[in-house]
């Protein structure tokens, strides 16, 4: 069978199973199987595929037709131009989340430049020649695969990233992604800010199959981290970024099969109104932000006004800004911890 005919049959089977983007997925699966890219595929579509390739290809098509996400079959997802490992233990990084990373990175880069300039102006020419811009401490809360924290560490110079998640399995994947992308990140395990309070650092080499009672398997145990600081002093950050669970519980049943049946419910369910995690984060984040520190949150398409009110009602943050995606829908909210008057 010619490669062109093989892929066309794969596309037909995926379309029949209700898979969106069946054409793209049929090609991606062939490229994954054979190790070629789509340019090479295009140039060689008239070549004959051997029987072994046909059988292996249709097994992948069968798996995708059962609505297993493409990324769970290939084991990877591109995000911000970097490759990330994914598994059923983490939410697959979405293109929409790149807006959060882009806005956070822009703020860090601009802040670094303005802070360095202000210090140079204050201290004179000699200081300008030999001083370094400040290092920023960033917390990636509910880090999942680590896509946000790893991307920020790749894009921004002189930042120190801490990433936390309640799932040890997710942290194991995030640790692999940090190593894969050659960035240093400190991983801590716990429920939102409880991870920062306890200072329990997660070994990023921990076994992805580890259970919830400890590192388990071949993974290593938790050990005290620098987050404990001295005495009872709390670690504070220049920026907290988070893409927490924000889907209404009643909406989960109508999600695509790939999402509701194959991605971790822990990363999806935001409670009855989808705002449970935001309430907790907004209520506590000011205790972990430095004066003037930034809070960036990814939000649902219709949650902007609810988040704006929630933030303003605390009286602890600046007037929040709602950032929209290309379709004009709510996507990110950002605000700053108020500085003392």
Residue ranges and their predicted role:
Residues 1, 16, 23, 50-54, ...:
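Short, solvent-exposed loop/helix junctions and linker helices
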Residues 1-77:
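N-terminal auxiliary segments of SAM/dcSAM-dependent transferases
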Residues 7, 26-27, 54-57, 67-70, ...:
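A general structural signal for well-ordered alpha-helical segments in protein cores
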Residues 43-45, 55-113, 117-157, 164-176, ...:
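SAM-dependent Rossmann-like transferase core, predominantly class I methyltransferases
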Residues 112, 123, 128, 217-220, ...:
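Basic polycationic patches enriched in arginine
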Residues 155-160, 164-216, 223-224, 233-339:
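S-adenosylmethionine
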